[in-house]
Amino acid sequence: MSAPTICPVCPHHCRLAPGETGICQARTNRKGYIVPSGYGVLASMALDPIEKKPLARFMPGSNILSIGFYGCNMRCPFCQNYTISQRAPKQNARRVSPREVLADAAEFKRTRGNIGVAYTYNEPLTNYEYVRDTAHLIHEAGMVNVLVTNG
């Protein structure tokens, strides 16, 4: 059996044997590489007021497309999103590509005044590859990216 691989994504530095998943439920050791457990598996997607992020002074009165993933590297007893943040991605769940998020964001921009995408509801950086890929497309389309993070 291979030696455990240390996950570099958060301060927990989980030591994962092949096939094991970290405390966040979002990172897995596959053949010695730490990879996302569910790239593109969204737990939630909704158009929210920017103030809900909570950003009271950043483009007040605007809407933003909020997306969230499964898993989180913290165990906050007061978490309002506990049901999604403390679960592993559903293996049979539909995957949403970054281009599909861009299409939804652009449609909401046209019809509802959307300003971009907020990565929220859990710790988005446990899925940093998806955030990176999506944020690049959103930025190129002239919209904003907002990270609601615990770090």
Per-region residue spans from a language model:
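Local cysteine-cluster metal-coordination motifs and their immediate loop/turn environment
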Residues: 5-27, 70-82
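Conserved Radical SAM active-site core
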Residues: 29-151
